[in-house]
Regions:
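Glycine/small-residue-rich phosphate/adenosyl-binding loop
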Residues: 1-57
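Small-aliphatic-rich amphipathic alpha-helix that forms the alpha element of a beta-alpha
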Residues: 30, 38-89
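Short secondary-structure boundary segments
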Residues: 34, 80, 106
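Solvent-exposed alpha-helices and their adjacent loops that cap or buttress functional pockets
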Residues: 21-24, 92-94, 123
Length: 145
């Protein structure tokens, strides 16, 4: 993976071990896309902020994720795939944007911590460290690796 070159060992090996695990083990894989040509050239909101179409797709993914969880179905968002690879394998037209590649499947239980947090990849940030009130502060959250 191209992005693995940016990571030093021993984290690189851990990163590469995540790559295909969910894709191969899940019951179903879903590629969620956004087609900016749908609904015509004028869509309220999208003319002033073009990204709102993609934001709406992300909200739909979140809603699907929450609905799946209530049914005992786990969802994993695979973010270490190349969009170009997805386009080629799934024959996605150039104007359509792959937004999410999801792995879904029944799970025995939901863990109390996300897998990446459990494995030490990244810690969970405190809510107070990522919410700003009234203005953007200069201090960025401290991420400990």
């Amino acid at each position: 993976a191209r992005s693995s070159n940016l990571i030093e060992e021993p984290r690189r090996s851990k990163y590469l071990s995540y790559k295909l695990e969910g894709i191969l083990d899940s019951s179903i894989n879903v590629c969620v896309t956004y087609d900016p040509t749908k609904s015509g050239s004028f869509v309220i909101g999208r003319t002033s902020i073009p990204e709102t179409g993609m934001f709406s797709v992300c909200c739909a993914v979140q809603n699907m994720w929450l609905a799946a969880r209530t049914e005992g179905i786990g969802v994993g968002w695979v973010s270490i795939l190349s969009n170009e690879t997805l386009r080629n394998v799934l024959h996605i037209p150039d104007h359509v944007v792959p937004i999410a590649y999801l792995c879904l499947g029944h799970v025995n239980k939901f863990e109390s911590k996300p897998d990446l947090e459990k494995s030490g990849w990244l810690p969970r940030l405190k809510l107070d460290d990522v919410i700003y009130h009234e203005e953007w502060l200069q201090d960025e959250p401290k991420i400990v690796r």
